[in-house]
Design a protein with these regions (language model features):
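Glycine-rich phosphate-binding loops of nucleotide-dependent enzymes
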Residues: 1-164
Length: 164
């Protein structure tokens, strides 16, 4: 299970570490790495995800703190994709991201799900919920207040009605 918190910069990435190290974080303590083995594989993995997600950076060794917010979010997505998690919890993952980066992330999220994984998307953006989700579950006081299946009217109005 992977988790992308809303505050990627403080809760998900280590700014002083490189793009490569952040993407390959789940493998950093794998056998063989304490002796310096595996570095080329990290660079290859990071470069592959940089290309697939169109992460705009100078090199895999660039500190992740030097990237734009959208590219940092792409690094965080790449981290969980390379970890081969089957469930990904995403909390406000697209908030404040430039349109070009947003499209890349939308496309990759859809590919991730088509590959058999599941995503729990937590969002206050009704259009995202309606466009990306198979179902929208409206939560109220810790319980499901309403389930809106794909194609249902997952608008601000219908969601607010479920909350009242």
């Amino acid at each position: 299970i992977g988790y992308l918190p809303e505050d990627t910069q403080r809760q998900a990435l280590i700014g002083a570490m490189s793009v490569e190290q952040n993407i390959c974080m789940s493998q950093l303590l794998a056998p063989g790495l304490l002796c310096g083995c595996g570095r080329a594989s990290f660079t290859h993995t990071a470069s592959d995800y940089m290309e697939r997600l169109r992460i705009d950076c100078q090199s895999p060794q660039q500190p992740v703190s030097q990237l734009s917010w959208g590219n940092q979010q792409k690094v965080n997505v790449a981290k969980w994709l390379q970890a081969n998690c089957s469930i990904l919890i995403m909390e406000e993952p697209f908030k404040g991201i430039a349109p070009a980066a947003l499209l890349d992330l939308y496309n990759y999220v859809c590919q991730f799900v088509l590959g058999g994984a599941s995503i729990l998307l937590i969002s206050s953006n009704y259009a995202e919920l309606a466009g990306l989700c198979d179902a929208v579950l409206v939560m109220k006081e810790g319980h499901i207040a309403k389930r809106l299946p794909r194609g249902a009217d997952a608008t601000a109005r219908s969601i607010l009605e479920a909350l009242s």
